[in-house]
């Protein structure tokens, strides 16, 4: 609460501020990032956190590099990989919707998050959008994505982050030549070895979106998620939907950003 901005004259009672999943009940006035309907009617949930758990989870193997005859060799380490993990559970009891948010920090510094939506009420619950985000500081003023076509894929393009929303959508059922692997926000003129950079990636081989957005009262926000068609995800009572992982990286230049993924 100490980080929330003060109330602005002539605006809402609470000044909008980006979170990992901002909703209208938090005074978010940007693009909708959590869209659900019950029996055809859209719900605007006011979630209350019911549980937070921090733990270290054994998650796969750690690989150690050795050099033999001048060539690197990768071997499984004796100790399993341990990943710091935070799991938060929130619920809107009145509207019958539960949300479980999970965030992991890899040993490289890569952050990844996902959310699970659970229908705890009566009637069918249609999930239209769950777009998770990473708030970024004020020095992130320039957007970098890639575009292209056959024989000219992954061509970089830049533009300033202005008030409003920029999004890069992949709607061909898999990442196409036009798809961007990362959406990066950084200091103006950032490069491979200079400038603070913050990047996001949706770990999904289907339809997806990456976005950058800034409101008049806030700093910027990176976001991403799966693009769902109407009726594609409909939950009966007790059923759940889990989003793809949305990965976030940062660094002094793009090389450091990439190193956290690799």
Q: Could you say what each language-model-derived stretch is?
A:
Residues 1-214, 229-231:
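Polysaccharide-binding surfaces and accessory modules of carbohydrate-active proteins
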Residues 113, 226, 248-251:
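Functionally constrained cores in energy, signaling, and assembly domains
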Residues 131-132, 217, 260-262:
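Short intrinsically disordered coil segments
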Residues 207, 250-251, 255:
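Short, acidic Gly/Pro/Ser/Thr-rich loop/turn segments
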Residues 216-236:
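Short acidic, Pro/Gly- and aromatic-enriched capping/linker segments at domain boundaries
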Residues 233-251:
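Short Pro-Gly-centered flexible turn/kink motifs
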Residues 242, 256-262:
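An acidic-aromatic substrate-binding cleft motif
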């Amino acid at each position: 609460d100490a980080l929330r901005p003060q109330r602005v004259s002539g605006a809402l009672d609470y000044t909008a501020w980006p979170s990992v999943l901002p909703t209208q009940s938090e005074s978010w006035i940007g693009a909708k990032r959590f869209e659900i309907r019950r029996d055809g009617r859209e719900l605007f949930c006011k979630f209350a956190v019911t549980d937070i758990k921090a733990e270290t989870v054994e998650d796969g193997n750690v690989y150690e590099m050795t050099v033999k005859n001048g060539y690197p060799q990768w071997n499984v380490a004796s100790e399993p990989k341990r990943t710091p993990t935070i799991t938060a559970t929130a619920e809107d009891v009145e509207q019958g919707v539960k949300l479980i948010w999970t965030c992991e920090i890899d040993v490289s510094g890569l952050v990844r998050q996902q959310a699970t939506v659970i229908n705890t009420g009566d009637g069918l619950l249609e999930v239209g959008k769950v777009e998770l985000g990473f708030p970024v500081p004020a020095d992130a003023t320039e957007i970098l994505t890639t575009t292209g076509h056959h024989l000219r894929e992954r061509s970089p393009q830049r533009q300033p982050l202005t008030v409003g929303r920029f999004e890069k959508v992949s709607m061909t059922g898999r990442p196409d030549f036009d798809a961007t692997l990362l959406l990066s926000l950084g200091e103006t003129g950032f490069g491979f070895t200079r400038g603070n950079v913050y990047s996001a990636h949706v770990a999904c081989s289907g339809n997806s979106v990456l976005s950058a957005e800034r409101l008049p009262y806030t700093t910027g926000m990176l976001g991403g998620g799966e693009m769902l068609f109407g009726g594609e995800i409909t939950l009966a009572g007790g059923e759940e939907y889990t989003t793809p992982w949305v990965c976030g990286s940062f660094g002094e230049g793009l090389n450091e950003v990439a190193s956290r993924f690799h």
